[in-house]
Curated annotation (Swiss-Prot):
Binding annotation for Zn(2+) 1: 74, 107, 170
Functional summary from the UniProt entry: Catalyzes the hydrolysis of N-succinyl-L,L-diaminopimelic acid (SDAP), forming succinate and LL-2,6-diaminopimelate (DAP), an intermediate involved in the bacterial biosynthesis of lysine and meso-diaminopimelic acid, an essential component of bacterial cell walls.
Gene Ontology MF, one: succinyl-diaminopimelate desuccinylase activity
Protein name: Succinyl-diaminopimelate desuccinylase
Family as reported in the entry's similarity comment: Belongs to the peptidase M20A family. DapE subfamily.
Amino acid sequence: MTATLALTEDLIRRRSVTPADEGCQAVLETRLKALGFTCEAIVSGPDDFRVTNLWAVKRGTQGTDGKLLAFAGHTDVVPTGPLEQWNSDPFEPTHRDGRLYGRGAADMKTSIAGFVVAVEEFVKAHPAHAGSIAFLITSDEEGPAHDGTIKVVEALKARGERLDYCVIGEPTSVDTLGDMVKNGRRGSLSGKLVVKGVQCHIAYPHLGRNPIHEAAPALAELAAEVWDQGNEYFPPTSWQMSNIHGGTGATNVIPGHVTIDFNFRFSTASTPEGLKSRVHAILDKHKLEYTLDWTLGGEPFLTPRGDLSDALSAAIEAETGVKTELSTTGGTSDGRFIAKICPQVIEFGPPNATIHKIDENVEVRFIDPLKNVYRGVLERLIA
């Protein structure tokens, strides 16, 4: 069994359902300290949602004047769902048909193990490496993400810590290892809209105001609106409704209000304030009586082609023969926080077809090549 596979299996055995870490970071800390890393635990969150974060750094011969390459990842995993639907224990790594099964196999314990072993090999080969290496690991990525990476970033920013490059181990590949990496992500802006009416008997509509009827034309306009055209890196901004709640459950009562949940996934071609203003203008045009609460989940971020993307692309092609595609599709990630203190942030990991699913798995044939790609990035940027 290879070192990467062994560490991956060790991490999968730990039932680290968010925000639990279940000793994953202690395993990493032991191995990193043996390499000369300085490790710092940053614990945050209320007693009923305690989050464990690890910041570990090893300075190169150039000290703080040299480049710093960080790896960011999360030890927490999503819940398993119905255990009876799994073909094996989700927390007992199991091999079938060339695949390693277990919760977190793809998202993202294989990536964490791969980078740790890559660093072990790199430090052994280059004990006097010029640049610095860091790990930013959290147990609050799959949850609300209020006390995870964002808290570490705040602490690093407060003391003036500079990151030059960051690789996030998210599972970005699609059909084969290395066919896609993420060099940015769209922003996320959510709204909870409550349109008010006047409740009454459905047979006497003149005695009330139906908020569903009043809201419908505005919702149709919002759904049809072209928010922007996107740009060379991002698709056009998308507005989608996720939930509509209205009525008492009775079929003879016009409701007093209707609640609509919606979300923007927006590109760098739009801003949160600009989107908010346009939504309010449409609602006001339809003369609705409403309240609207906004939640900004994250700003979009983008890493144009540069040292990090070039090094990663070259490492992928050297190991796999695949020419990778830079993409900004998909949901948000902790990159939205890290981009505030790091100019070059890229996500790369194994194929994502089974993440968050029953029988999550990773193909064993990709595990050590993933590690080799990570080592290739280290060799190209900080040796």
